[in-house]
């Protein structure tokens, strides 16, 4: 079953809270991982690994740099789920 964008965003919010201490209420599609949510590069690697496991997708290293916002990640995961 394919997850809805909201389910993916909620899952990412849980991951961001666990990995980087981001409040789930602060996670929105238009939020930048680095600028708005203060996720550093090391934490981003952990977020990607957790998202791959949670959603059963592979996010190539060269694709990670294109995932600038939560919405970018949601779109990628939904397209590749």
What is each stretch, according to the model?
Residues 21-22, 38-39, 57:
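Helix N-cap/coil-helix junction residues
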Residues 28-40, 61-69:
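Glycine-rich loop motifs involved in handling phospho/adenylate chemistry
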Residues 44-66:
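Phosphopantetheinylated carrier protein domains
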Residues 55, 77-80:
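Hydrophobic recognition helices of helix-based DNA-binding modules
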Residues 71-77:
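C-terminal structural segments of small proteins and small subunits
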């Amino acid at each position: 079953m394919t997850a809805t964008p909201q389910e993916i965003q909620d899952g990412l919010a849980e991951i961001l809270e666990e990995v980087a201490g981001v409040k789930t209420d602060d996670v929105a599609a238009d939020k930048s991982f680095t600028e708005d949510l203060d996720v550093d590069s090391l934490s981003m690697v952990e977020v990607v690994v957790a998202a791959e496991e949670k959603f059963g997708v592979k996010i190539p290293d060269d694709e990670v740099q294109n995932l600038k916002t939560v919405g970018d990640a949601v779109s990628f995961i939904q397209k590749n789920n």
